[in-house]
Structure formats: C-alpha cells, structure tokens
C-alpha cells in the first residue's frame, strides 16, 4: 500500500494559514487532497472559508472539521482516527492538516511518527509526514512576541490550566518546522522584513524560508518536498545548533542587522538568588536564550532555562549523572559515552551552558554580569543548603 504524504500547517492565530491553504487548493493541479481543519471554537469558521474558497470537489475530495479542541492534545485521538480513515479510503493523493493557531507542532508530528499502542493505530503504515510548515505574520510578529501576554490573557487558552505564554508558543512553532512562510510581507518595509527574516533564520537555521503576500505560495513549495525528518527537526533550533556546533558561521546579513549569538559556559554553580535577579532584568534585546543551568541550591538537579521575549522559565529536567549512585553512573556512561567528553574529575557533568541569540548583544557585559552570579570562593566553601532559594518548585520527589 502506497503511503499518503501529509503536510501540516502551523502558525499563530491570524498568521494566514487558511488563506495559504485556499491558495494551495486553488492551484493543486489535479491532486486529490483531503483536508483536516482544526479550530478551537465550536463553530469551525476556518473550515467554512475553505469550503467557500478552496473549491474542493464533493466526489473526489474531503474536508474534515475538527472543532472545539486542539489536535496536539484534546483531539489527538480524533486526529488518529480521522487520518486512518482517510488513508484507508484510497481516494486521496495527499492530506493537508491546518492546526489551530494555539497548537504546538511537535505533538502533531509525533502522532505520525510513532505507534499509538493504546488505540492500536499505527499511522506510519499508511502515511508519510512530508512537510511541517509554520506561517509567521510578518506584520504582527514582534507585537505578539514582545507582548508579555499569555493565551489566558487573550482568552485563547485550552482552559484555565493552560498557562502558556504567547512568546513560548511562537518559538515552539518556529523551532520545529521544515518550511517557514513569512506572510503579509506587503504590510512591512523591506528593512523590517530583512531584519525579521534574519532573526528568524538565527532561531531556525534549517528551514526553507518563503516570503508571501496573502498566502500566495506555489504548491510544490509545501507539498511533496520530502523534507521532514523527526530527528533533524527536533535538533534544528538555533540554540541547539549553537550548543552542538560551537559558534556557527555568522553571515554578512546577520552582522548587518546586528543579529548575533554566543554561548556562556562555566564549571561553577550560580548563587540562585543572584541568578534569579539577573533573569528578572535580562537585557530586552535578547530574543532567545536557552540551556542547562547549575545552581548551588539544587546541586543534584540539572535545570533548564528557557527565555522567549518577556517569558522566562526555569525548571528541573533531570538529575546530574554525577548525582546518581555509582552503579547507575557507570550504566549511563556506558549507554551514553559522549558524556565522558565533558566529564570533570571534580564536578562530573555539572556545568552551565546557555545560548543567547539577539540583536546588538553586548556579550562582554552579559558574560560579566553572569559571572557575578557565580559562587564566590567564600560561598563555594560554605554550606550550600543554607543559601536562600527563590525558585519555588513543587518537586515530585
């Protein structure tokens, strides 16, 4: 059985996903396309627009509406069932999925990449995820990214427990894609567009970039590209590239617009209070920062710091290998020998590695300020458990 290729469209509310979808459908050149449109509201407005403007044939094609939920979580099971139905139908050459604007792309991609043992559905038998597309509104990106608002603030959340920040959602969509479409380019100046594109290229160096007006993109740009690879997409974010490959080559374009990046790496722990205060006053021209942090007051835990615009989070992700019992340490070292490359005789794998991406970054000042957050010699020799800890995590021990 021939596998049906699938393209997934992601992008924040109002970026132009439905307009792009209609543009593709109007120029599909004989392809029989099944379309799934996901909308958070009870009435699927986007699906109505696709029906009106997409020109889908009632006999050869199909539009599936998935409303009142999100395919990356609450409607994930429904997505599995619908895609399996469409694939087994045998009438379609292609499936295009338009995610809701608040959907994160990774869970959707996982739906096509792994077997769902609970439901007994294996989409990898019927489908091939071909392209992950993210649409960015060139006109409103900075407004949304720097707003400091959450989805709850804008009444766009999945529920009261959905505390996601808009900047974090935008980053999730940008950092996991094969094709990034900068839409509404007619609404910004060429200089603004150049700067935005160069910042986004720094955040997502792997993706193909396409500029568009009113979602006007050639179908071959997002259909049958063969670009998707889960492992590559997962490691494609700019901050990961910087950590794994050291300093990437800085192109003349990024230098022209003052866009730069650097890695801060230290083998001493931060004093939690000083680091917490620094996070609170991080320079506003840092667009993205992410990495692993070693804090003295949580000496056994590797902490993940993630910043996107005004949103900053820091939380434990795992135990340091050096904090594990000796037997477990040896097992991990055998399974992941690359750990030994960074292993320190005294501290083991404990270290801080942070990537900073931004415009007109003052690397020297940021480095100096962070160094002042490290333990002093006196503090290093004292009892770390007595340090004040401003990070109020509810740790599930």
UniProtKB/Swiss-Prot annotation:
Motif (CXCC motif): 70-73
SMART domains, A to Z: CobW_C
EC number annotated for this UniProt entry: 3.6.5.-
Domain CobW C-terminal as annotated: residue spans: 259-374
UniProt binding sites for GTP: 11-18, 73-77, 183-186
InterPro entries: CobW-likC_sf (IPR036627), CobW-like_C (IPR011629), CobW/HypB/UreG_nucleotide-bd (IPR003495), P-loop_NTPase (IPR027417), Zn_Chap_cDPG_Synth (IPR051927)
Catalytic activity, as annotated: GTP + H2O = GDP + phosphate + H(+)
Recorded GO MF terms: GTP binding; hydrolase activity
Disruption phenotype: No effect in wild-type, but required for optimal growth in strains lacking the ZnuABC zinc uptake system.
Alphabetized UniProt keyword annotations: Chaperone, GTP-binding, Hydrolase, Nucleotide-binding, Zinc
Description of what induces expression: Repressed by zinc via the metallo-regulatory protein Zur.
Keyword Nucleotide-binding recorded: yes
Homology family: Belongs to the SIMIBI class G3E GTPase family. ZNG1 subfamily.
Record's function text: Zinc chaperone that directly transfers zinc cofactor to target proteins, thereby activating them. Zinc is transferred from the CXCC motif in the GTPase domain to the zinc binding site in target proteins in a process requiring GTP hydrolysis. Contributes to optimal growth under starvation for zinc.
Protein's name according to its UniProt entry: Zinc chaperone YciC
Organism field: Bacillus subtilis (strain 168)
The organism's taxonomic lineage, starting at the top: Bacteria, Bacillati, Bacillota, Bacilli, Bacillales
